[in-house]
Amino acid sequence: MKEDKVYIKYKEFAKYYKLSNYDTKKLWRIIEPIATHKEFSKRCSDPYFHHDIKSLGDHILCDAIVTYKLATKLKRNSQNMKDINIDNAVVIAMFHDLYELPWQNIGVKKIMRNKHGFVHPIEAITNAITWYPEYFKSKERAMIIIDGVIHHMFPLALRRIDNTDMELNNKEKYDKLPQKYKDMIKLSTDIGKIGHYSLRKSFFIEGRIMSRADKIVALKKDIGSFNGYLALISGKNKNIKKKHNKNGDKNEIRNKQS
């Protein structure tokens, strides 16, 4: 097994969350095809800071670990949870935040409903389908994964697909998606619609488990400062600027769109 930087990070997080050696190896077998992709690896370092100064890739790996632990515990201990598909829950975790561009300290202005917090689930599922099409061959599995990713922010709302411009950072990829996937994404956002938004939890237990894991990781481990919490509202994080200044870079991260 190659000891690349993503795997080394994964082992550190598995130890932090007290995953057994057996489960550490088992979970890695599930996520390895996703975690070793070049696009995932890119999101494990600067400039992809997700919450505070924690990288996006680090956040996703931690979400996958906590999702695995929650799903495994529920499946083992609850009689009515025996049908939980642990693999699907973990895959949702690995895909849920695969958005296109860093979102903190960028200079691009968008209308409120098209800001990062509302549209990033659509960007994430678009990238997941584009980069990992093998996970979406089965219509049933595709719907479970899509719905879980789209509604992982619950109880927060997301942008509904309603034929108005979403200002997606990966619009070209979205436009190239096969129509069947666009239809599934739209269906997922139409249910629970409130104006330009959609507000509901995932229909599927795997998505609900992942959504819970996401809150545990974000609120208990990712964000460790006032500036980090403030960035969730303002999109500007002074901690990133301080980190860059400490490393000799006096410029904030800028969004370099091609």
Where are these regions (language model features)?
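Metal-dependent phosphohydrolase cores
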Residues: 1-258
